[in-house]
């Protein structure tokens, strides 16, 4: 399924710009296949769409050319630079998988790959197993205004049962005029006395029960999404990887048009290596488990991407986590929140930046449940965060608000974890957050600080 240009770019329904394949010395090719040499088969909207978290481009590829090259591993995409002559050696992002039904494509270039305040130049490319072909026409674009961090007045709690290297804080400062209660714990897990661990159990348990199992547990919060049958996503415990992140429904509402559509997607993962150094990446599995420095930019209502691989969405990073667990979305990457709630115009849940295909009861501009998040600061300190929601004292947080709260705490990288009734923080043996709305929920996994 392809996104209609008159929906996503209503202001751009103008005469299309024809991108003529440049096959001369500028592109490093003197000989080109006769079947596509000199053919204008890509049409590009004359303007890029700027959002606070991305630049969006729309183009159309001649279907006959795609079909003629299906045996040559065809790929389309966008490349960009800052000096006006982009080639894939500068920066590029492959587009959706090309099939016999491909044609109009919409491609989102995430702020993870761009810097605020800079002007970029974009052009389309098409390549097969032999050649790379560039369009002559180039489109200018830049990110919109960067969202601002959210800061609160925090009170440090008295926690004599914890090592001095672990601190816990509380706030009841209002969030955008709403009642709000939140807690966070912070520690340097590269220190000599505290480490971070992930727990993944063979039976479902409350966070309280999981904390009580180990007297070395200092602070523990819930972690991954789950079903009754077990934890979802990818986890790493003691260096051993398990699980998968592959494809997801476009919507979990049976009545939604995208309920029966599936999209490959990466999901956010937080973890530490054997030295306790924290990292945040996107993870996906396509025959193996991969970690990436960018999301697969899947777009609901548009053509799906190919499965994650050693090339898509990029070459994997070389990361060997000792403890890690996925959920999502990534809230912060290099200090930038890579999503907002911009809609494509196709209807409810058709978000421009829900790359991780997060369900409607978690991702949305009116969804404010309890939240759990984990992140780390520029100097490597890990922060475990929770907030209450859906109760009189605390009305919860949007995911975009959660990202800016984590940024306000000094985080440069952060991941959202399961929330709602799953959200719990245990400090020592004490539960921090509200438990009146729902009995303590059993969960399959948790993440926290432990004495060494």
Q: What are the roles of these predicted feature ranges?
A:
Residues 2-12:
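Bacterial N-terminal signal peptides that target proteins for export
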Residues 28-145:
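Short, surface-exposed linear motifs at loops/turns and structural transition points
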Residues 146-287:
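Zymogen propeptides
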Residues 188-191, 271-278, 332-335, 376-380, ...:
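Short acidic-glycine loop/turn motifs at beta-strand connectors
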Residues 230-260, 351-413, 422-452:
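Conserved, well-ordered active-site substructure
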């Amino acid at each position: 399924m392809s996104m209609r240009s008159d929906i996503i770019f209503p202001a751009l329904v103008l005469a299309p710009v024809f991108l003529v394949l440049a096959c001369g010395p500028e592109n490093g090719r003197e000989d080109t296949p006769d079947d596509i040499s000199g053919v204008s088969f890509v049409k590009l909207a004359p303007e890029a769409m700027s959002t606070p978290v991305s630049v969006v481009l729309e183009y159309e590829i001649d279907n006959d050319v795609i079909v003629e090259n299906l045996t040559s591993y065809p790929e389309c995409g966008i490349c960009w630079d800052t000096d006006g002559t982009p080639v894939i050696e500068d920066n590029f992002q492959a587009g959706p998988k090309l099939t016999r039904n491909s044609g109009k494509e919409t491609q989102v270039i995430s702020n993870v790959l761009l810097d605020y305040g800079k002007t970029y130049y974009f052009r389309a490319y098409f390549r097969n197993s032999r050649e790379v072909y560039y369009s002559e026409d180039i489109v200018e674009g830049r990110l919109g205004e960067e969202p601002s961090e959210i800061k609160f007045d925090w009170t440090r709690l008295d926690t004599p049962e914890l090592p001095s290297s672990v601190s816990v804080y509380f706030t009841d400062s209002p969030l955008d005029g709403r009642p709000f209660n939140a807690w966070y714990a912070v520690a340097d897990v590269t220190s000599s006395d505290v480490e971070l661990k992930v727990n993944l159990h063979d039976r479902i348990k409350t966070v309280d029960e999981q904390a009580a199992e180990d007297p070395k547990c200092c602070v523990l919060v819930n972690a991954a999404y789950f079903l009754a049958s077990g934890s979802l996503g990818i986890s790493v415990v003691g260096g051993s990887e398990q699980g998968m992140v592959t494809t997801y429904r476009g919507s979990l509402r049976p009545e939604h048009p995208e309920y029966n559509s599936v999209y490959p997607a990466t999901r956010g993962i937080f973890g530490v290596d054997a030295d306790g150094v924290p990292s945040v990446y996107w993870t996906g599995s396509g025959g193996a488990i991969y970690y990436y420095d960018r999301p697969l930019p899947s777009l609901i209502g548009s053509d799906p991407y190919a499965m994650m691989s050693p090339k898509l969405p990029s070459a994997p990073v070389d990361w060997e986590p000792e403890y890690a667990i996925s959920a999502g979305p990534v809230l912060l990457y290099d200090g930038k929140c890579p999503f907002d709630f911009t809609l494509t115009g196709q209807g409810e849940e058709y978000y421009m930046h829900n790359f991780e295909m997060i369900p409607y009861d978690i991702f949305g501009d009116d969804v404010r449940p309890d939240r759990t998040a984990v992140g780390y600061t520029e100097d490597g300190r890990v922060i475990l965060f929770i907030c209450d929601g859906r109760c009189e004292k605390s009305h919860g947080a949007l995911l975009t608000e959660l990202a800016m709260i984590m940024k306000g705490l000094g985080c440069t990288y952060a991941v959202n974890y399961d929330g709602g009734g799953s959200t719990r923080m245990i400090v020592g043996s004490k539960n921090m957050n509200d438990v009146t709305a729902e009995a303590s929920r059993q969960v399959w996994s948790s993440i926290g600080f432990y004495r060494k």
